[in-house]
Curated annotation (Swiss-Prot):
Belongs to the universal ribosomal protein uS8 family. One of its GO terms (molecular function) is rRNA binding. One of the primary rRNA binding proteins, it binds directly to 16S rRNA central domain where it helps coordinate assembly of the platform of the 30S subunit. The gene is rpsH. Pfam families: Ribosomal_S8 (PF00410). One of its GO terms (biological process) is translation. It comes from Campylobacter jejuni (strain RM1221). Transmembrane segments: none annotated. This is Small ribosomal subunit protein uS8.
Amino acid sequence: MINDIISDSLTRIRNAGMRKLETTKLLHSKVIEALVGIFQAKGYIESFNVIEEDKKKFINVVLKYDEKGKSVINELKRISKPGRRVYKGKDEIKRFKNGYGTIVVSTSHGVLANDEAYKAGVGGEILCTIW
């Protein structure tokens, strides 16, 4: 049984990138779907789609690589964990890695990237960082 579906999904993406796999399959939830939607919008993955197998939903993620065959994801890190939640205000999530990275924040407006959360003027729980 998986206790933390977000950590599991991030680990599956990270491991697939290290093994240079074209796709990986994640367990479905609304938060994971929003998370990979942000990854796609920011250019860290090619695409994703929701599939259903035996009455269970999964998210199929197509990974993205550069011209040398290296994954475009340098680091994918879970910040807030079930045992230690991390919350930040809007002023503390403005930039990450001088604008090259992205912080994914769970806010009252949904799951947002750090720049979108800053524009909306909301803070929240820091789910993960990616660059």
